[in-house]
Structure formats: C-alpha cells, structure tokens
Curated annotation (Swiss-Prot):
Protein's gene: MYO1C
Keyword Membrane in annotation: yes
Free-text description of this protein's post-translational modifications in UniProt: Isoform 2 contains a N-acetylmethionine at position 1.
Protein name, as recorded: Unconventional myosin-Ic
Residues carrying Phosphoserine: 408, 536, 864, 1041
Entry keywords, A to Z: Acetylation, Actin-binding, ATP-binding, Calmodulin-binding, Cell membrane, Cell projection, Cytoplasm, Cytoplasmic vesicle, Membrane, Methylation, Motor protein, Myosin, Nucleotide-binding, Nucleus, Phosphoprotein, Repeat
Molecular function GO labels: actin filament binding; ATP binding; calmodulin binding; microfilament motor activity
Complex and partners: Interacts (via its IQ motifs) with CABP1 and CIB1; the interaction with CABP1 and CIB1 is calcium-dependent. Interacts (via tail domain) with PLEKHB1 (via PH domain); the interaction is not affected by the presence or absence of calcium and CALM. Interacts with POLR1A. Interacts with POLR2A. Component of the B-WICH complex, at least composed of SMARCA5/SNF2H, BAZ1B/WSTF, SF3B1, DEK, MYO1C, ERCC6, MYBBP1A and DDX21. Interacts (via its IQ motifs) with CALM; this precludes interaction with YWHAB. Interacts with YWHAB; this precludes interaction with CALM. Interacts with RPS6.
Domain of life: Eukaryota
GO cellular component: actin cytoskeleton; cell cortex; cytoplasm; cytoplasmic vesicle; microvillus; myosin complex; nucleolus; nucleoplasm
Lineage per the UniProt record: Eukaryota, Metazoa, Chordata, Craniata, Vertebrata
Function noted in UniProt: Myosins are actin-based motor molecules with ATPase activity. Unconventional myosins serve in intracellular movements. Their highly divergent tails are presumed to bind to membranous compartments, which would be moved relative to actin filaments. Involved in glucose transporter recycling in response to insulin by regulating movement of intracellular GLUT4-containing vesicles to the plasma membrane. Component of the hair cell's (the sensory cells of the inner ear) adaptation-motor complex. Isoform 3 is involved in regulation of transcription. Associated with transcriptional active ribosomal genes. Appears to cooperate with the WICH chromatin-remodeling complex to facilitate transcription. Necessary for the formation of the first phosphodiester bond during transcription initiation.
Native source species: Bos taurus (Bovine)
Length: 1063
C-alpha cells in the first residue's frame, strides 16, 4: 500500500488512511505527533519551522522568502528559537478548536509544529513546575492580530486549565472582560477594523493547582483624541455605534438619542459609520451580557450609558458669538440632556462651557471664552469624561477579577502569568504626539526584548557549560536615552516647555530641541538638515532615527496634548456630578491640590518604566505579529510591508542573537531517540548513558569539532547544514529500514497466516468428519424406523385408527393433500379431481365443494357491474328459452346490449312526450295489424313503467306493465312475439303482434323490466291473441326450409320458420 501524506495548516504532516475518506492519522515517534525535524524533508516547499535553521540566516530576503512559503501553505506560525512569529491570515483557518488545544496540551515545545497554543502551554507548564511568574509579550503593527492572539491565549487557558474550587466565575470574567474593553477602547482605523487604541497588560493569577483565581489589568495611553476627531475612513470607539444600533428603544429615548450615527458630530468626521465587517447590533448584545458577567449592576450600566450618551450630546453642543464675541450655548435641548445625564446643574454647566475660572492672588475670576476657546473646552471635557470613565471601567473590571481569597494562606503560593497586548510601531503620513509615545514604547520594549533574549541565551549556555560568545547587535539604548534622559531627553524638554511661564508654543519647543540635542546622530530637523534632506522636512517637524527606521513627527499639538488641560471650572462642575461613576472619576481632592499634575508624556514614561520592571521580574515569552497586507485580504503577501515590519520588530536582530552561537540544540535523550538508527552501535537500542550514546552517534556521523558542542544535558549544533545532512541521512536510512521491516513483516505475516490456515483446516476436517458420521448413523436409524412403521400401517390400513397404522394413515393423508394442492381445478368449468383414499373420501367431497365455492366467489368478485348485469340477463334468458326456443342457442354467444337505438334515432317529440321518464331499452320492430296483418315499422321503447310503441314522431301505443298479462312466442326459430294486455283496458285495442330481429334479447329485457319472467309462454303450433272487442286472431307456426310470414286463406297469420337445431 502506498504511503500518502498531507500538510495541514498547523504545520503537521499527517498520513491519509484513505484518499476518499476524512480519516487521517498524524505521524510521529509516539504515533500521535510529528516533531519539528520531521518537517525538514518538506522544507523546500513549506520552508523551515524555525528561522534558526535558515542556512543564510543573515539574509533578510531568505527570511522573507521562508515567511512567504509558509504563508502560501497557510502555515502562519514560525519560530525564532522560543520566539513565535505570527502572520495574520485574515481568515479562519480552523486551527483553534478544542481538538487542537488538546494536541498542544502537555507536549514539549518542539514536539509539535509552531502554534500559539504551543507557546501558551509551554508558559503554563513553566508557571506550574518552576513556580515562577511568566509573561507573554505580544507586539506588532495595528491589524497584525495582537488582540486576537490575546483572546486565543485566554481561550486556551480557560479551556485547558483546571477549574477553581469555586467554579468558573473568574474564568468567565477573564474572557468577558475582552468584549467590554474592546467596545470602549477599540475602533476602526484605516489599517484595522478592530484596532486597540490603548495598550493593555493583563495579569492572570493561578493557584498552586494551576487554576485561574484572579486577574488584574493595566491600561496605557488611551487615544482619547479619537473621541472628538477621526481621520477620513476611521470611526470613533465601538461603544457609540453599538449603543445606537443595538440599544433598546426605551434606553435610547431615556438617553435622548436616535439611531442614525450621522446625527452626531463626533461620529461623522470619519464618514465611515457603517462597516461591513462589523455587526454593531450583535456586538452590543455581547457587551451587555459581558457587563453582567463582570458584576455590573443595572444602575451601574445605566450610569455608564448615560456618560456615553453625554459625550455624543457634548459633540452636538454648539455656540454662537454675542455682541462682544463671547461664546454662548445655542443648543438648549442638548444642554437639557447633558444636565440630566451628567447629573449637574444646567446653569453651572452652561457657565463652565463658556467661561474659564482663573485664580489670581487668591481671587477667582471668570473670563469669557470666544467661539474657538469654547469649542476647545467642550472637546476637552468630552475627552476627559471618556478617558476617565475608561480608567474607572478598567478599575471596575479589576475589582471583579480580584481574587476573593487574597487573605488566605494559600494565596502566597499563587503565580502570575502576564499578557502584554501593546500597540506596534506606527509610521503614518502625519505623525503626532500619540505616535511619538507609541514608538517610544516600542523602543523600550525592543531594548527589553534584546536584553532578555541575550540574557536567556547566556543563561542556557552557562547552564550547559558552553563558552559564551559575544553577539554583535544594534543597541537602541541611545534612542531610549534620547527620549527619556533627564534634563536632556525629548520628554524632559517637552515638560519644561509646558511648565515654563510665558508664551510657549509648539515651535518654541522645537527650537529648544534644536538647541539642546542638535548633535545627536538620531535626531534631525529642517534647521539641522542638509540642503537635500530639507526637501522632506517641514519647519514644524523633527525626525528620529528609530531602530525600525526614520519617523518624521509634526510638533503641532505636542504641548496641548502633553498638558491635557481641563479648565478648573469644568473640573468643579464634574466634581459636583450626581452620577456615581463621574463622582469617582472627578475627585474633589484635585481642586484643593495646588501641585501641577504630571504631564501625559511623563505619566506615560513612568508607567512604561513600571511595565518594564514588571516584565523583567517575569520569565518572558514572545509573540511577534505581522500584517501581510494593508487591504486585509486573505492570501495576499505584500513583501514591502512585511520587510518593514520584520525590520522594526527586530526579527533579524533576534535571529542573529539566536544564531550567534548554535542553530540547533536538543536534549540528549530526544536526539538519540531520533537519530540512533544512523549508527550500528546505537541501533536498535542503547543501554548506556544518553550522552555517551550521542557521542558515539556523532562520531559515526563524522561531525567536525567546530560543528557541535556537548553540553551537560544537550547537544548544540552550530550550522543548519549539519542538521539538514543528518536529517537527509535519516530519511535514506528510514527507506532502507522500512524495506527491511516490510520484508520481515511480510514473511512473518505470511507464515503466521499459513499456520493459522493449517490449524483451522485440521480442526475443520476433524469436526466435519465427525459430523458427517453422526448424520449418516442418525439417518440410517430414522430410515429403518420409518420403513418399519409404514409396513405395519399398510398391513392394518383398513383397520380403525390405532397406534400401529396412525403413521401410515397420516402419511397417506399428507400425500393426498400435497398432491391435491398441485392438481386443484384451474377454473369453475374444470371438473377434474384426484381420487381420494378411502379414509379421506368424505373430507375430499367437502374440500371439492369448498374449492368450487371459492372459485365461484373469486370469479364473482372479479366481474364488473356491467358484466354482472349481462350475466344476470343471460341467466334469465336461459331460464326462459333454453330447450324451448329453437333459435336460443344462436343468441347465447351474442352479448345483450343496453339499447339498439341511439339517442339521435329517437324523435325529439317522442322524448318530449315521455318527459322525465328514462328509456331503459330501445329496439326497432315490425308491427302486424290485427285485421290484415300488414307489417309496419315501429320502435319499441322500454321505460320503468311501460312498453311504448312509436311510429316516427308519434307514440302509437303505451302498454303499462300493470296491464301486460303475458307474452307469447313460438318454439320455432321465428322472431314473432305477442304482447297480451288486459281485455278490460278500454285504452287498448287488443294484443300487439311484433317482430324483432333480436327477439331473445328484447323479450328478456321486457320480462325483466315488467317483472313478467314467469309470464312468457312458448307455444307450439299456434298462438291465439285478442284482435279487438269480441274478436280473436290466430297465428299458425309450421316448420319449413325458410322464414315466410303471410296471411293464410283461413284468415290466420301463417308463419313458416326453419329449424336451426335438432331436438
């Protein structure tokens, strides 16, 4: 049988049991899984599963080509050592099912193809076995699949981890926190329909049994400017559209909202309210359910939605200038809704939106705002309300996720697994303050990534006793220092500009940068650039040379966004809010605190430093996400875009670090188990230490000293070509081993089959001979007994039934009945019947009569009503004429028909004269006069009540059946007959003499219609009839050679008729 294999999206090579059936088996040493090395034979088609095995590992083109090959085969995961590289397929590959989770659960990292679940399981097992906190760092560009990867990790832990003792409440809250955070923190951008507009770090706490018992979420730098402004083709945060699309009518009415997003200023700027890939209505149902799961009360949900609605109403609040150019609120309806939703006084809110409170020398002064300032204050309030509500929402979720057993002694044994879903490096056509912060974050994480990767490599080498070799790589510390260094860094200069008195602007900030860090090799402005570079730099821009490439930032809005200014009277108004959530978001302590709050950049820098410390305290795992194209199309591989991401993710740096020492490393046990067949000394079993076996094996394979090193528990192979050569040799060895195994197996199988057949044949032959002997003896015994009984019965066959003749009598009876069954009569006319034995004569007669009745019954059931009527008439004709009328035998084979005249042959006047009386039978006849016997053509009609004689269109005579006394006919073959009527009937002139060509049929139907079957007289010689009052007529019948009807000299009607049948 030919071996058929197939590559599936997980990267596994599976054996197809039958090409036309869906049953498949994975190949591997354990019969279930394949190892990474098993896929090396297919490397020319699908690439290598670990970039470390690339021969030309320094070539970016080779790196991207390997990515392309795997992407083309729907293999979206590839390793760089322990780092997982994921390419977004933009479609569902069906590789995240429960079955896939079980495949990767509890399996060594390299025993299965690359997958997110392999990373998840490795991290989880390290968390449990080493009792050390872990962290999974997920990074990549917007739209690369970071949020989806985070959700898949949480799904894996929710499905595979043991349930806590108190049920799955924590597990459900961890999963349901995602839809809520996505609704309030994600939005549609040009690059991603579900882009996270904030950074997220989630800690999941596990007890000593490995069950999730709690969690905590940290959020970073929400893009709150999106609340008031979106670029073309982008949307605001999802929650606004979900509320409008999915909210109940009563809810929207209470919030003063309508369903059309085009009605709200904050939702129309991107001109992209509807997105085909987003179902806001169904997402709203998911969010509402999730809020319940994470312990939101109905009052809290109502307060939260009031805040969301208030942001929309703020966007629709408009101003107009009065005579002094001061702003005045013109949308009173919006103000009314805002007053109710925010829980503040209307007059206070109106004043706060149109005035600014200034404290000078201990005195409070109100300064009116112009239109531009009022719009700024309104937008600042909207951003502050939304961003602080988001912060409160994260804190609320954290309270829901907090473990309820934090005070118990077992709490000390908990471990933490961190999930970092942070925004990727961003380079847009116009880059502002948000991109500066995001890219600074990526610089810090890249610095941490290189440090931790080098550290883990060095620790492994030291643990294995391998000499550490220094690695050349780009250290981006110089860029991090450029941004964050005290006094000289960009953030310090930005803060200084924000805090200094006087007219500080974005351009003065840029000038300060040029004066302070103009000599830095990674910093450039229009003023500092050469003549050629100035063409690509405006005067209000500066350029940073990041590790991922150059990014040009526009300083417009830097100071404003860094200050994040909210006027004091707006804070005071919000602090007085009766909305419980806003009451927690705007604390009155802010009003009494005279200290200027930290700037946004400083807050972000401090939180980022804290995050770095958190990640350093944990054992890291990395998932690097790549977006294959900007159009979000499955199957499209944009090489330019991917090369850019490979660069800014530092994947080539990571690969160089990993390959600086050795490309491949494996435990001695695993290496020996896989390749032991290549050496006669280690095949088929090695009984010594695995390390000694590997030493013998590599010596036999001819490894050069510079190609490998032997550690304490692992073998290290420096070059991929060495591993490829070993793998190719293994493939050849497997072919020869397979041939040998097949030959041995075939011989063994055939011999075993022969021995089984031989044993079976002997057993069957022995059993069958015994069976035949027993059957033959039993048959002889039975035959002798039967013959003896038959002879005894034959001798006593005439005696009464007794035990001696009972068998013979029963046999005779049975034989007769069986023979009778084969010789039963086929029809009622068949009178044959087998001769019965004396003992069955009476039973035979009963059966014969029963059989005849049964045939008659079957025949009667089979005839139609018309045929039944025909037979009945024939039976009446037979009863009347059989043996009495000479021409009767000739009428027997002729069928009686219902009428001899069609409807068109009877004059309509006759039909009119009869009225509703139906005609049962009609026949043409010849009527003979009573005196001269002149023949006249007439029609005889039978109705239910009378015989009617018709001449053309006139009814000549009507004889009621009650007046019909009889019918006379001769015994010869003539066709004359006489209808006798009562002599007392004055309406009748006498009897009627008629001739019909169908005399038997006519007389039978007349007799049946008139009920005169017994009144038909068949006469010989002559018939006397009443010719009129007091006068009789005579018809004389004589046999002759031919039919002749004449008037005789004696005044009689003479009829000569031939004889048709001898009597």
């Amino acid at each position: 049988m030919a071996l058929q294999v197939e590559l599936i999206p997980t990267g596994e090579i599976i054996r197809v049991v039958h090409p036309h059936r869906p049953c498949k088996l994975a190949l591997g040493s354990d019969g279930v899984r394949v190892t990474m090395e098993s896929a090396l034979t297919a490397r020319d088609r699908v690439g290598v599963q670990d970039f470390v095995l690339l021969e030309n590992f320094t070539s970016e083109a080779a790196f991207i080509e390997n990515l392309r090959r795997r992407f083309r085969e729907n293999l979206i995961y590839t390793y760089i050592g322990p780092v997982l590289v994921s390419v977004n397929p933009y479609r569902d590959l069906q590789i995240y099912s429960r079955q896939h989770m079980e495949r990767y659960r509890g399996v060594s990292f390299y025993e299965v193809p690359p997958h997110l679940f392999a990373v998840a399981d490795t991290v989880y097992r390290a968390l449990r076995t080493e009792r050390r906190d872990q962290a999974v760092m997920i990074s990549g560009e917007s739209g690369a699949g970071k949020t989806e990867a985070t959700k898949r990790l949480l799904q894996f832990y929710a499905e595979t981890c043991p349930a806590p003792e108190r049920g799955g409440a924590v597990r459900d809250r961890l999963l349901q926190s995602n839809p809520v955070l996505e609704a309030f923190g994600n939005a549609k951008t040009l690059r991603n329909d579900n882009s996270s507009r904030f950074g997220k770090y989630m800690d999941v706490q596990f007890d000593f049994k490995g069950a999730p018992v709690g969690g905590h979420i940290l959020s970073y730098l929400l893009e709150k400017s999106r609340v008031v402004h979106q670029n073309h083709g982008e949307r605001n945060f999802h929650i606004f559209y979900q509320l409008l699309e999915g909210g109940e009518e009563e809810t929207l009415r209470r919030l003063g909202l309508e369903r059309n997003p085009q009605s709200y200023l904050y939702l129309v700027k991107g001109q992209c309210a509807k997105v085909s890939s987003i179902n806001d209505k169904s997402d709203w149902k998911v969010v509402r359910k999730a809020l319940t799961v994470i312990d939101f009360t109905e009052d809290e949900v109502e307060d939260l939605l009031s805040i969301v609605a208030s942001v929309l109403h703020l966007g629709n609040t408009h101003f107009a200038a009065d005579e002094e150019s001061n702003a005045q609120v013109t949308t009173e309806n919006q103000l009314k809704y805002l007053t109710r939703l925010l829980g503040v006084e209307g007059s206070t809110l109106r004043e706060a939106l149109t005035h600014r409170k200034i404290i000078a020398k201990g005195e409070e002064l109100l300064s009116p705002l112009n239109l531009e300032q009022a719009a700024y204050a309104r937008d600042a309030l909207a951003k502050a309300v939304y961003s602080r509500t988001f912060t409160w929402l994260v804190a609320k979720i954290n309270r829901s996720l907090a473990s309820k057993d934090a005070e118990s002694p077992s709490w000390r044994s908990t471990t933490v697994l961190g999930l970092l879903d942070i925004y990727g490096f961003e380079v847009f056509q116009h880059n502002s303050f948000e991109q500066f912060c995001i890219n600074y974050c990526n610089e810090k994480l890249q610095q941490l990534f290189i440090e931790l990767t080098l550290k883990s490599e060095q620790e492994e080498y030291e643990a294995e006793g391998i000499a550490w070799e220094p690695v050349q790589y780009f250290n981006n510390k110089i860029i991090c220092d450029l941004v964050e260094e005290k006094f000289k860094g960009i953030i310090s200069i930005l803060d200084e500009e924000c805090l200094r008195p006087g007219e500080a602007t974005d351009l003065t900030f840029l000038e300060k940068l040029e004066d302070t860090i103009k000599q830095h090799p990674h910093f450039l402005t229009h003023k500092l650039a050469d003549q050629r570079t100035r063409k690509s730099l405006d005067r209000g821009e500066f350029r940073l040379l990041h590790y991922a490439g150059e990014v040009t930032y526009n300083v417009t809005g830097f100071l404003d966004k860094n200050n994040d200014l909210l006027f004091r009277n707006l804070k005071e108004t919000m602090c007085s809010s009766e909305n419980p959530i806003l009451g927690q978001c705007f604390d009155r302590s802010e009003l009494s605190d005279k200290k200027r709050p930290e700037t946004v950049a400083t807050q972000f820098k401090m939180s980022l430093l804290e995050l770095v410390e958190i990640l350093k305290s944990k054992e890291p795992a990395y998932v690097r996400c790549i977006k294959p194209n900007d159009s979000k199309q499955p199957g499209r591989f944009d090489e330019v875009l991917i090369r850019h991401q490979v660069k800014y993710l530092g994947l080539m740096e990571n690969l160089r670090v990993r390959r600086a020492g050795f490309a491949y490393r494996r435990k001695y046990e695993a290496f020996l188990q896989r390749y032991k067949s290549l050496c006669p000394e280690t095949w088929p079993t090695w009984t010594g230490r695995p390390q000694d076996g590997v030493t013998v094996l590599v010596r036999h394979l001819g490894y050069k000293p510079e190609e490998y090193k032997m550690g304490r528990t692992k073998i290290f192979i420096r070059f991929p070509k060495t591993l490829f050569a070993t793998e190719d040799a293994l493939e050849i060895r497997r072919q020869s081993l397979a041939t040998k195994i097949q030959a041995t197996w075939r011989g063994f199988h055939c011999r075993q089959k022969f021995l089984r057949v031989k044993r079976s044949a002997i057993c069957i032959q022995s059993w069958w001979r015994g069976t035949l002997g027993r059957r033959k003896a039993a048959k002889r015994k039975w035959a002798a007994q039967t013959i003896r009984r038959l002879i005894q019965g034959f001798i006593l066959r005439h005696a009464p039934r007794c035990p001696e003749n009972a068998f013979f009598v029963d046999h005779v009876r049975t034989s007769f009945l069986l023979n009778l069954r084969r010789q039963l009569p086929r029809n009622i006319l068949d009178t044959s019947w087998p001769t019965p034995p004396p003992a069955l004569r009476e039973a035979s007669e009963l059966l014969r009569e029963l059989c005849r009745k049964n045939m008659v019954w079957k025949y009667c059931r089979s005839i139609s009503p018309e045929w039944k009527q025909q037979l009945q008439q024939k039976a009446v004709a037979s009863e009347i004429f059989k043996g009495k009328k000479d021409n009767y035998p000739q009428s027997v084979p002729r069928l009686f028909i219902s009428t001899r005249l069609g409807a068109d042959e009877i004059n309509p006047r006759v039909l009119q004269a009869l009225g509703s009386e139906p005609i049962q039978y009609a026949v043409p006849v010849v009527k003979y006069d009573r005196k001269g016997y002149k023949p006249r053509s007439r029609q005889l009609l039978l109705t239910p009540n009378a015989v009617v004689i018709v001449e053309d269109a006139k009814v000549k005579q009507r004889i009621e059946y009650t007046n019909l006394t009889g019918i006379s006919v001769s015994s010869l073959s003539d066709s004359l007959f006489v209808l006798h009527v009562q002599r007392e009937d004055n309406k009748q002139k006498g009897d009627v003499v008629l001739q019909s060509d169908h005399v038997i049929e006519t007389l039978t139907k007349t007799a049946l219609s008139a009920d005169r079957v017994n009144n038909i007289n068949i006469n010989q010689g002559s018939i006397t009839f009443a010719g009129g009052p007091g006068r009789d007529g005579i018809i004389d019948f004589t046999p002759g050679s031919e039919l002749l009807i004449t008037k005789a000299k004696n005044g009689h009607l003479a009829v000569v008729a031939p004889r048709l049948n001898s009597r």
